[in-house]
Amino acid sequence: MARFVLRRLLYAVVVLWLTATLVFVFLHVSPVPVERVIGGPRATADTLDQIRGNLGLDRPVLVQYWRFAGRLLRGDLGDSYINGMPVTALIGQRLPTTLCLVAGAAVLWFAGGVLLGVLCATRARGLGDRAATVFVLIGLSTPPFVMALALLHVFSAGFGGGAVHLFEAGPPLQEHFLRRIVLPWIALAFLMIATYTRLTRGAMLDALGEDYVRTARAKGLPERRVIARHGLRTALAPVVTQLGIDLGALVGSTIVTEKVFGLQGVGQLVYQSIALGDTPVIIGVTLLVTSFVVAANLLVDIGYSVLDPRVRLR
């Protein structure tokens, strides 16, 4: 296990380095010059040359890359081109909101999807199973931004405000924010609850048909114990694997969700940075998302081996 974790950590370092390099190259060949972004449309040629010199953009590309790599190794992501703030501080201000959004939605969809999937599998072809099938079809057909807009229109009158002013930006631990972030959770989780209900139902039906489950029932074990200890544990393995994949997609979905609900999170930050051409912030957010995805997949691999003892990490 220790060797596996160490190897995956080294793999994570390589992935982060390649990601940073690719982003650096893509942004370096951007059709919008950085000095034009900072100086504005009315900047003179002398002003643009001065900006390029201050940023070191007049040096060869390899020199710029090694300078960028050296700062990255020190944990220095540079300063924002737009407001001059350090990128780490800028991301740190927005990160709690996005973490609260991602964590809440992930817990909601995983718990809700697994619970509904188990109930459908244990009552296959019953009324509840058929109702859940209809819910799954609706959920799979509803994109998160459509659900977000629908929730805004339905609940805005109840909160006493329009869609624009319904959600106030602020730390996620404030009472008003906790109360109002439930709707973004639902908007993000609705589609995934349907997906995980279908996935868990199929995996659970396969697990309950295995010989070791029939043996456990033949021994007279209580049905709840058979389902929880023998059926669910095996059925969760593919579900947890899918969770590692979907967590990365969830981070991307927060960009649209934060935009719709007016939440000042990392998704809103990267949206604004792309629109304004703020290169350091784009690189910083990209590395953050990559780190999150790599860490999530590492935890999923470890969890898979715990759920299914037949799997051994090497």
Annotated model-derived regions:
Residues 2-3, 91, 95-130, 144, ...:
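Alpha-helical transmembrane segments of integral membrane proteins
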Residues 36-38, 63, 78-81, 147-149, ...:
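Short, hydrophobic secondary-structure boundary micro-motifs
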Residues 22-29, 59, 70, 134-165, ...:
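Membrane-water interface segments at the C-terminal ends of transmembrane alpha-helices
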Residues 58-114:
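An internal, D/E-rich "acidic patch" concept
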Residues 6-15:
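N-terminal signal-anchor/signal peptide hydrophobic helix marking the start
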